[in-house]
A protein has these predicted regions:
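Conserved C-terminal structural/oligomerization subdomain of aldehyde/semialdehyde dehydrogenase
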Residues: 1, 52-175
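ALDH superfamily catalytic-core signature
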Residues: 1-69, 94
Length: 175
């Protein structure tokens, strides 16, 4: 998958020093996400972090994280084109990593899975405390509703009691 990420314009961040720079620019001092990264392009974030040689057309900075959940701030939500990559050996291990990240930040929100294996889809859905499971669709956009999935179109997604919200669905005029 990393090879495909590269083909699609990802810059893979593996160097420990570059990862530390990325952590610091996104989460200064290990705290809240930096508002200065919001909405920036991948090359702009890289420049802010002092990461050299990132091509101008780079679409995402993909950092190989050092752990799951609280073990690495790059597992947290980032409102910019930065993502974490965490290798795993089995499907179950991958789902366990996802659950650990959701427990740390994101409980009740959503997951996305791309699979033709119904057993894998069901397994992932059952393991996660989420309000919506997006299957074989771009979850970043269709979790908020789409004519192809039956979710109510919205820009406000409830996380239910897992996320300390009063509702678990997609907010609409009916709520």
């Amino acid at each position: 998958i990393v090879t495909e990420f590269k083909k699609q314009g990802a810059y893979i961040v593996e160097d420990a020093e570059e990862k530390d720079k990325l952590r610091e620019v996104c989460f200064p001092g290990g705290g809240a996400f930096s508002r200065f990264c919001v909405g920036n392009t991948a090359p702009e974030v890289a420049e802010q972090a002092g990461i050299a040689d990132v091509p101008a057309g780079t679409r995402v900075l993909a950092a190989v994280v050092d752990g799951v959940g609280a073990a690495d701030v790059l597992c947290r939500e980032k409102l910019c084109p930065v993502m974490g990559i965490l290798p795993y050996k089995t499907f179950e291990e991958g789902v366990a990593n996802m659950v650990a990240n959701l427990e740390y930040e994101g409980k009740g929100h959503s997951i996305g899975i791309h699979s033709a294996d119904d057993a894998h889809i069901e397994y992932a859905a059952i393991q996660c405390s989420v309000s919506r499971v997006v299957v074989n669709q771009p979850s970043g956009t269709t979790g908020g509703g789409s004519p192809t999935n039956g979710f109510t179109p919205t820009t406000t997604l409830g996380c239910g009691s897992w996320g300390n919200n009063s509702f678990a669905g997609n907010l609409s005029y009916e709520q």
